[in-house]
C-alpha cells in the first residue's frame, strides 16, 4: 500500500507549505523528461507524487486518508465513513497537477525560481535589514532556501558532474544579480573538467560587450578578456581572490554529506562567484563596482610609497 506521506518525504503533521515544497522537489526529481533512460518507473513515480499532493494538500481529502487510507478515497471504505455515504475521489492527470504548481514556464529553467529570488536575497540581509556591502558581504547558502531546496540533491535539468577517468567535462548555467536586486541579469557559464587528477574550473561571463574568462585549479591559471590574455586583470584577480567555506566539523560530518562553498570576489566584473564542491554553480548576488575605486586608490598609494623610498 502506497503511503502518500512517504512518497513526498514529509511527516504526518506537515503543513500545507511543507506539502507544496515537497511536491516541487520530488516532482522535479521524477519528471519523465528528466529520466529518459528510466521512463517507465519515472512515470509511475510521477503519478504517485501527483496523487499524494492532491490528497495531502486538501484538508477534507487528507482527513479521510488519515482515517481510512486510500480505500476511503476510492469508495471501497465507504462503510467506515462517519456519515455512511459513499465518497469517491477521482485523481487528475499528473501533468495537470504539475502545470498547476509550476505554470507554463520551463520547469527545468532557472527562471522557474525568479518569483522566489527576492526572498533569497532578503535572507542574506543583516538583522537590521540593510544589505552588507563590499567583499565582506554575507552570501547565504542558497540551497537552504525553500525555493531552491530541490537543487541540493539533484539539479534542475542540467547535467550532473561526472568524472570520466582522467578527463571529464560538463557545463552548467547560473545567474548573477547586480546590487539593484532583480533588475539586471549577467549570464554566467561555469564549466569544470578533470585533467590528470586536477580539477580545472573555467567561468565565462559576457558583460558590457566584453567576454571575460577565468580558469583556475585553486590557483588562478589565466584571465582572458575577449579571448586575449590580460596581465593587469590577472594580477588584480590574484590579489583580490579569496575563499570562504561554511563551518565544517570533521567530528560531526563526513565529507560526503557536507557542502563546502567558495566565494571568489571579482570586482572587475562587479560579480561574486559562489561555487561549492557538490554542485558547480548556484545563484550569486553581485556587488557594486565600488571595489574598483578602492583598488585604484590602493595602487596609487603603493606607487607613492615606492617613490618616497627612491627619494630617500
Swiss-Prot record:
It comes from the Eukaryota. Signal peptide: none annotated. Keywords: Chaperone. GO terms for molecular function: Hsp70 protein binding; unfolded protein binding. Residues 291-312 have a biased composition (Basic residues). SMART domains: DnaJ. PROSITE patterns: DNAJ_1, DNAJ_2. InterPro entries: DnaJ_domain (IPR001623), DnaJ_domain_CS (IPR018253), DNJB2/6-like (IPR043183), J_dom_sf (IPR036869). Residues 272-312 are annotated as: Disordered. GO terms for biological process: chaperone-mediated protein folding. Probably acts as a co-chaperone. This is DnaJ homolog subfamily B member 7.
